[in-house]
Amino acid sequence: MQFKLLQRDFSSPLTMPELDFTVQRLSNRQPGGPDQATITATGSERALFELAEWMQCPVMLYDDHNDPAWWGYLDTLEINVGAIRLAVRMDQVFNRVAVVYSYVAPGSASVGTRATTAWVQDDDSVALYGVHELLLSISGATAAQAEAARDAALAMYKLPITTVEVNPGNAQNGATLTCSGWWKSLSWQYFGESGTSSVETSAQIAAIVVAEGAFLTGTLIEDASGISSSEYRQGDQSAQFCILELLASGTSSGRKLLAEINRWRELRIWEMPDRSGDNAEIFIRSDGQLDGISGVDVLAQHAPVGVWGLLKDVIPSSLDTNKIADPGLFWVEQAEYDAVTGVYRPIVAGAWRFGSEIKEG
């Protein structure tokens, strides 16, 4: 598999001739699509440290046919040089902050009504990384106290924080890049809606993406939910949380509503297919080989999820499937592909792990 780190504007790949990259593993989940990927890098110390300049840059992984297999951004970087390990993480970056507090007037012992400070942001950080919001909560505070807490949090978290560890084992020089899918970016901003109309849930999802999906290009609704609910949102939950709530109600036909970020960074919405072998998209043989409808020999490298799978030539025909659910048919909720061993590991609905490792066919 091939790894590419792109410019922040999603244009041409960055050129890093002093570094060699190796894809270790990737995973997908439903809902969301691309979840995590791990890549290791070796090369000069200078080039390893310069990777920190590219935090949150877009990442693409390509299969052995040079087709996109996974997409996301650089989320965490760990650098090992001699006895020193440095880690840089994006999940503690907050460049736009406000504080919710219960007001207590000076000289009073009673807690007043809920109040919220104005939002403040660091424009340089926002220009570099986009908006990462944090809504803190303080009980029994004055307005000045809440604003001081807000300003302190912004100063502390506006840029990625580097942690340092001493590793006496003197590990080999190198870096580990942990990447996250763009679904995670929907957790960076809160979503509020003052309207109180009853709106179809998939249309509400599309509206949330327009409002808060800064790194997404739009929504692709293949199947409308057919269910309506109040559009009102107080504004103290993330956009991702609001979308998950709307997905949870499913469709009017009683099936799950699925979501993934596709390769064009659209949030694709569709209905879970009926439980039927006719709807199976992946097939697992008794020797562990993974096949697809089109017979793509690199299917495992895409770690397919949100699909029905079927065991092929495994379950004996004598088994009475009127007494148990068809054991040969399963729904893949999560999956990981180990790029080193070529093994596909699905996790099926019901939170149990498929008993054998699935090898790349």
Residue ranges and their predicted role:
Residues 2-8, 44-80, 169-174, 197-211, ...:
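Short, acidic/charged, Gly/Pro-enriched secondary-structure junctions
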Residues 16-59, 63-67, 152-153, 170, ...:
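Extracellular/virion structural assembly segments
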Residues 8-34, 126-166, 274-291:
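Short beta-strand/loop turn elements enriched in aromatics
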Residues 1, 11, 16-27, 81-128, ...:
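Acidic, low-complexity/disordered segments
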Residues 17, 30-39, 99, 172, ...:
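Amphipathic, non-transmembrane alpha-helical segments in extracytoplasmic/periplasmic proteins
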Residues 88-151, 155-157, 197-230, 239, ...:
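Intrinsically disordered, low-complexity terminal/linker regions enriched in Pro/Ser/Gly
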Residues 3-5, 37-41, 59-61, 74, ...:
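Hydrophobic beta-strand residues in large extracellular and virion-surface proteins
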Residues 2-3, 60, 65-93, 172-187, ...:
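Short beta-strand-centered interaction patches in the first periplasmic/extracellular domains
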